[in-house]
Amino acid sequence: MKFGRLILANLFRKKARLVLTIGSFAVALFLFALLGVVNDAFSRGADVVSADRLVTINRTSIINTIPLSYRDEILRIPGVKYITHDNWFGGVYQDPKNFFPQFVIDPENQRQVFPELIVPDDQWNTFLKDRQGAIVGAVTMKRFGWKIGDRIPIKTTIYGLQDRSFEFNIDGVYHGAKPEDDESQFWFQWEYFKESVPDRFKGQVGWYTIRIANPDDAPRIAKTIDNMYLNSPYETKTETESAFAQGWVKQFGNIKFLIMSIGTVVFFTLLLVTGNTMAISVRERTNELGVLKAIGFPDRAVLGFILGESIAIALAGCVGLLFALAAIPALSRAMAGLLPPLLVTAKTLAYGVIAALVVGFASGILPAYGAMRMRVVTALRRV
């Protein structure tokens, strides 16, 4: 930049104010990145799900069960390729704070319905032969320091089995095909679950996940399933996996609106703080700006000086994004099981830089315009 040294000299004339202003930007951009990551985490379920999967639950509520006998009936519907069933286990490992999702799965069809959750064949075959076997996501394995072959006790809190301890052998680890895939789950066999719960739960499942041949057939198949069980004791609600994930997120409230509201307040406050800082800086240098104009600097150069300072402060504040890049993965590990994986994407960082530039420009344009319009005679009165 032609006048870069002059801009830097003006920036460092008030070092304490410079540090505080950059710090304000850094904190705001860190919060921006954190809020963006949390928003992505909650909306990711709807973004990464497969278009060829449907979810069938009890129409009353997901906590109500549906009969296992529905499985074969649904499988006979034209367009249905595979179907698997799951139950929420609700177990506790050592301490209630050690939450992670545990599912009773149908091992015969799990991999066909969820091909993106990858388990090595040898580990899966061992799991199939082990009544007490379990497959665990890589994130949960790392979180607790488990390894294949470990025997893990988990107490359930539901099904009338409070404080009953189930023993599991870790037979394998699954990994997601993409970084955003959920690797925190714990799977174990339906047969082991069925033999341990009261009779009223033995023929009941929590929900079905259905893989279909053509995503375009999803509305027809969903309607067919629900019509089959209309007016039955166990009516169903079938929707795409994306719609199901969005409905689940909505139970937490309007996360996106909340995050947008917080972000707007933060950046509006930052705009006021930075704009006031630049205005004070221009007033303090009125005589210097007058001298620059008197010796031949054009008005546009003065405008560029002030805007350059404001944008330089904004870019320096992007250190907050770097801090977020380092801190959020550690936060994600600490919150494993409580929140979806927190991933700082290139898009989030790019939006952060753009937001910084916009605020930097907006906070500097009025003081810069005032300096540009300033008359030399008026400015030099203070000399």
Language-model features: where?
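Hydrophobic alpha-helical transmembrane segments
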Residues: 4, 18-22, 322, 346-354
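Short helix-to-coil transition segments within interhelical loops
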Residues: 11-12, 282, 291-300, 374, ...
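Hydrophobic alpha-helical transmembrane segments of multi-pass inner-membrane transport and secretion
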Residues: 15-40, 252-288, 311-319, 359-362
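Hydrophobic, regular-secondary-structure patches
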Residues: 26-103, 107-109, 119-130, 142-143, ...
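Peri-transmembrane interface segments
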Residues: 38, 42, 217-271, 281-283, ...
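Basic-flanked hydrophobic alpha-helices used for secretion and membrane insertion
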Residues: 139, 146-239
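Transmembrane alpha-helical interface segments in multi-pass membrane proteins
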Residues: 279, 287-332, 351, 355, ...
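C-terminal membrane-exit region of the final transmembrane helix in multipass inner-membrane proteins
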Residues: 348-383
